[in-house]
């Protein structure tokens, strides 16, 4: 009903009407919190949550981000987080991490040279891909990371390898809040799959497409794609299955008619198996569908913090 509609924009942080961006543009939305796996920037999700959502206390968040960046030897990502969050960086630790990064790149270059000299195309591709992943995790400039992925891409004719690079670059786009780049990669991946791709990668693409449509506020298409992936979820580089169910339930609650919500979400075995693992989500869904609005509003306050 109309009352239920009023909370939708708040829950998913729609900007006010005069500031809404058209589809396919950059968007500093909750999309940034999704990218902390695969080829994403180290600590991207935690950094986003602390800056945009105000989640967690400062000391615990700093320790977590430092462990994910400096602790993993990724100095550029650490310095970027410090600059973004107003922290004074540990310069000695950052310098040591930077030296580790340089050593890793040198080792990967040596591995690539050895593969070219003594091994085959698969080993060459693996070395180039590993270097691109290292640059991405380090937080190297986007142009350098893309160039490294393109070099790996040029060394393979396998559709699966090309799709895997597309997915890893999509994670990078999510970390950088670049929805234009993400849309281009989604289109490229769809073309590759149309030419011939396996079911596992087709199912992974549906999740990425669902995330994109969620980010550009096309909640109906997002719900359709995410719901179609509930039984085949294979995109753990984006988020856990529980987090995937969380987004699916919230978006479906926004987009689906009540009868469809009951059939595809409220009574869905896969949803029921995971919904209890997410704080407030089970009571949010049950109360919303059952029109118990006092209970719903109590659950909603917890859900809003998680979105």
Regions found by a protein language model. Give the residues of each.
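Extended alpha-helical scaffold regions
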Residues: 1-307
